[in-house]
């Protein structure tokens, strides 16, 4: 058998070679930049939370207990009521005790006014110098309130004459003060303290304090 002549064989078709396609490269994501307005808003919110927390801590620290006031002694001298003009002249002497029940908080009295009255009609008053109370401190305030020719209502004049004839008059003591509280580095804002002491029974026949019944005042801050 004669082998085939390669020259007479048909030429083979060559397949075109495909060029490898280049794969697209992943582009790095650009760095995200926060919006400046958003940064400011976040900062303000955080600042507000910190301030609120500080206020809460300060309030819990400086939340004051009720101050305790009592009238320890009271007397009157030169008590007189005019028969024709219903005017009063008198010198009222009071010993008032202020007690700060706080363990770690001091009290600063920026101003204080003490007045005495009969049936809500003031007849004398006096301003007390500023002072400071340390924790667990008791302060005695001795003061004299002078009534000099003070006009009374007809009802009060008649009632005081009747009480005087019995030897004891019923008076009221009012205390108004501007105070602030301090502990460590925190100081509270100024507040108005009010105390009402009633009834204060005063012996008009003697200036002695024997037999006086101590009066516990009602305080409000």
UniProtKB/Swiss-Prot annotation:
Mode of membrane association: Single-pass membrane protein
Annotated GO biological process: defense response to other organism
InterPro entries, A to Z: LEA_2 (IPR004864), NDR1-like (IPR044839)
Region (Disordered): 1-30
Polar residues bias (residue ranges): 12-25
Keywords assigned: Membrane, Transmembrane, Transmembrane helix
Annotated signal sequence range: none
UniProt-annotated location(s): Membrane
GO cellular component labels: membrane
Spans through the membrane: 37-57
Name assigned to this protein: Uncharacterized protein At1g08160
Organism: Arabidopsis thaliana (Mouse-ear cress)
Phylogenetic lineage: Eukaryota, Viridiplantae, Streptophyta, Embryophyta, Tracheophyta
